[in-house]
């Protein structure tokens, strides 16, 4: 069976996207007519939302709500987001575009301070059993779900219907290939960017895509050899929104889940019936040991915990017991590598015990919840040690028709927050294949709200992509007291309207006060209902105050959508992988021997 998407030349849209955009066009024309704008051909208007954590999530919801209220959202063809804005965009689609309902639900969550820790923990525990478990899973289910107070079980592919019918704009969610970040920093390589839509996932600059339902499955030489279930939106939100802070800050954030005594109780409590054996509860002891080792491998109490565990197991006379006694005796002199090997060995031993109930009968091992939590803590510990994020199978692995060795030699990809590159998804709507005429870019970044313009201008200059010219002096001057909107236009390429969140128009002289009030790493627990309402209000004001400007630019591109000169598509796709056989489409095919979990 031939898959609907594969590695395709990037000089054309994927067929499903092309059909959805075509279906959207009459809806756009109808919306423009309601706005008293006449057009024979629907211009392509894209709305972009930047990263910025929970601040971006709430502010982007405010922007979408006001765009819809003013009748502007119906004239939009593409919605694209980075990091926190992807959370808002995904909410729009899961709620069928009902912005009033989304807004009321958002306020309710923060008024009631709702978040189900146990459900989130169970999701993370189940994810830790996957071969490709990474910190993205932990982050998604225990951090992001807490931030936005929502677990979303639905899949990205489930959002196709309203997109295919043209009811809502076509969504694009941005990520970055972490393994290519060094190339990005040095050369701003195009193939660093990765995108997700309800139909596909892949590298737009390479023209390499896989159906979204097969994202995360194992491919080899273009054939699907092991199918994996489609990941839910909670996981994807964690992948799209993982650039909250620097490494040290994130690491401490994760470790605090296990250091906090209350957190430990949360992990151990639940419907667990501990053994009434004369020896101690081995299951709880092992979990306590793993958590102690995770938070501080040099903790002096670890040796005592090992001694107690050894006594409870009663393994002093067998081979493993002798090994255990030896490592306990020399624990303080043992290398970190050997300590880790022993801990893995210990857990493997316990796993075998579950399978052989005649072994160590005194353990009365609880084979369910506590064991799962031990595995979860230990797998998370390994990921922290290796700092592994966004691990998924590479659908280009060993593909015979891919010339780029870097892209086809890796069995695994590591996808992370696109904010590590540019905090707004300009690179995903600027390629000429999407023929964007007008971009409404809403910036919710911390710090300089013009930095994304600066970074995008540099990126476009390197790759001969049309983008309005901006001078560094001008950007610096604007950043001192940002206006709510800047209109940028060049001789070629789309018109860009860049909106700043906190500006002199809605904050007066208190811009810095507002920025401090809504820090990127600010936890949702510190967001009061008033803070949520205020952020929604100022983000809406930016749209409302600039309605006339937006309509003016819409009118201009609608009057002459062909005014954007054609550019050399090959030049704009300089990093695109070339098929060594020529211009033919490289396809994926399902193997006759597909394994399923």
From Swiss-Prot:
Listed GO MF terms: calcium-independent phospholipase A2 activity; lysophospholipase activity; O-acyltransferase activity
- Specify whether Cytoplasm is a keyword of the entry: yes
Query: Where in the numbering of this chain does the PLA2c domain appear?
Result: 1-597
Q: What is its EC number?
A: 3.1.1.4, 3.1.1.5, 2.3.1.-
Question: Any keyword Transferase?
Answer: yes
Q: Which sites are catalytic?
A: 83, 417
- GO terms for CC? cell cortex; endoplasmic reticulum membrane; lipid droplet; mitochondrial membrane; nuclear envelope; nucleoplasm; spindle
Keywords recorded for this protein, A-Z: Cytoplasm, Cytoskeleton, Hydrolase, Lipid metabolism, Nucleus, Phospholipid metabolism, Transferase
**Tissues and organs where the protein is expressed, per its UniProt entry:** Highly expressed in ovary, where it localizes to oocytes in preantral and antral stage follicles (at protein level). Not detected in other tissues tested.
Q: Which reaction does it catalyse?
A: a 1,2-diacyl-sn-glycero-3-phosphocholine + H2O = a 1-acyl-sn-glycero-3-phosphocholine + a fatty acid + H(+); a 1-O-alkyl-2-acyl-sn-glycero-3-phosphocholine + H2O = a 1-O-alkyl-sn-glycero-3-phosphocholine + a fatty acid + H(+); 1,2-dihexadecanoyl-sn-glycero-3-phosphocholine + H2O = 1-hexadecanoyl-sn-glycero-3-phosphocholine + hexadecanoate + H(+); 1-hexadecanoyl-2-(9Z-octadecenoyl)-sn-glycero-3-phosphocholine + H2O = 1-hexadecanoyl-sn-glycero-3-phosphocholine + (9Z)-octadecenoate + H(+)
Chief place where the protein resides: nucleus
Functional description taken from the UniProt entry: Calcium-independent phospholipase, lysophospholipase and O-acyltransferase involved in phospholipid remodeling. Preferentially hydrolyzes the ester bond of the fatty acyl group attached at sn-2 position of phospholipids with choline and ethanolamine head groups, producing lysophospholipids that are used in deacylation-reacylation cycles. Transfers the sn-1 fatty acyl from one lysophospholipid molecule to the sn-2 position of another lysophospholipid to form diacyl, alkylacyl and alkenylacyl glycerophospholipids.
Report what the protein is called: Cytosolic phospholipase A2 gamma
Look up and give the organism this protein is from.
Mus musculus
Quick one: which gene encodes this? Pla2g4c
């Amino acid at each position: 069976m031939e898959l609907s998407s594969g590695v395709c030349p990037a000089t054309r849209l994927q067929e499903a996207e092309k059909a959805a955009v075509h279906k959207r066009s009459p809806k756009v024309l109808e919306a423009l007519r309601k706005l008293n704008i006449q057009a024979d051909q629907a211009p392509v208007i894209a709305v972009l939302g930047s990263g910025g954590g929970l601040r971006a999530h709430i502010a982007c919801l405010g922007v979408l709500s006001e765009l819809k209220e003013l009748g502007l959202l119906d004239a939009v063809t593409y919605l694209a987001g980075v990091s926190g804005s992807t959370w808002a965009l995904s909410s729009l689609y899961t709620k069928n575009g009902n912005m009033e309902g989304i807004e009321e639900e958002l306020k309710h969550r923060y008024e009631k301070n709702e978040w189900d820790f146990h459900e989130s923990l169970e999701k993370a525990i189940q994810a830790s059993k996957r071969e490709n478990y990474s910190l993205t899973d932990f982050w998604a289910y225990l951090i992001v779900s807490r931030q936005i107070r929502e677990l979303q079980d639905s899949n990205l592919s489930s959002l196709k219907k309203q997109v295919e019918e043209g009811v809502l704009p076509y969504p694009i969610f941005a990520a970055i290939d972490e393994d290519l970040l060094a190339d990005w920093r040095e050369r701003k390589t195009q193939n660093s960017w990765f995108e997700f839509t309800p139909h596909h996932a892949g590298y737009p600059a390479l023209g390499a895509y896989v159906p979204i339902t097969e994202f995360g499955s194992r491919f080899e030489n273009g054939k699907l050899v092991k199918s994996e279930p489609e990941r839910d939106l909670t996981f994807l939100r964690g992948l799209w929104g993982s650039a909250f802070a620097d490494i040290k800050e994130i690491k401490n954030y994760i470790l605090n889940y296990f250091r906090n005594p209350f957190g430990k109780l949360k992990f151990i409590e639940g419907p667990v019936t501990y053994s009434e054996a004369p020896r101690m509860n081995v299951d709880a002891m092992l979990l306590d040991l793993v958590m102690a080792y995770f938070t501080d491998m040099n903790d002096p109490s670890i040796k005592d915990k090992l001694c107690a565990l050894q006594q409870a197991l009663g393994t002093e006379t067998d081979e493993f017991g002798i090994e255990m006694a030896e490592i306990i005796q020399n624990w303080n002199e043992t290398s970190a590598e050997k300590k880790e090997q022993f801990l893995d060995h210990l857990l493997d031993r316990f796993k075998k015990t579950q399978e052989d109930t005649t072994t160590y009968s005194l353990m009365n091992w609880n084979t369910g919840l506590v064991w799962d939590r031990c595995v979860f803590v230990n797998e998370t510990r390994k990921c922290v040690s290796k700092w592994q994020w966004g691990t998924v199978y590479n659908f280009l692995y060993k593909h015979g028709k891919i010339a780029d060795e870097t892209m086809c030699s890796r069995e695994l990809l590591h996808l992370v927050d696109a904010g590590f590159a540019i905090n707004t998804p300009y690179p995903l709507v600027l390629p000429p294949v999407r023929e964007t005429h007008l971009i409404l870019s809403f910036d919710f970044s911390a710090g300089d709200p013009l930095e994304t313009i600066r970074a995008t201008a540099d990126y476009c200059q390197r790759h001969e992509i049309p983008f309005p010219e901006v001078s560094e002096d001008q950007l610096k001057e604007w950043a001192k007291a940002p206006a709510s909107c800047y209109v940028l236009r060049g001789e070629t390429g789309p018109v860009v309207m860049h909106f700043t969140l906190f500006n002199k128009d809605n904050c007066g002289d208190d811009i810095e006060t507002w920025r401090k009030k809504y820090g990127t790493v600010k936890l949702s627990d510190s967001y009061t209902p008033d803070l949520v309402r205020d952020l929604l209000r100022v983000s809406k004001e930016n749209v409302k105050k600039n309605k006339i400007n937006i309509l003016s630019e819409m009118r201009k591109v609608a009057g002459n959508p062909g005014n954007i000169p054609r550019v050399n598509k090959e030049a704009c796709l300089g990093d695109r992988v070339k098929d060594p056989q020529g211009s033919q489409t490289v396809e994926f095919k399902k193997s006759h021997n597909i394994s399923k979990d």
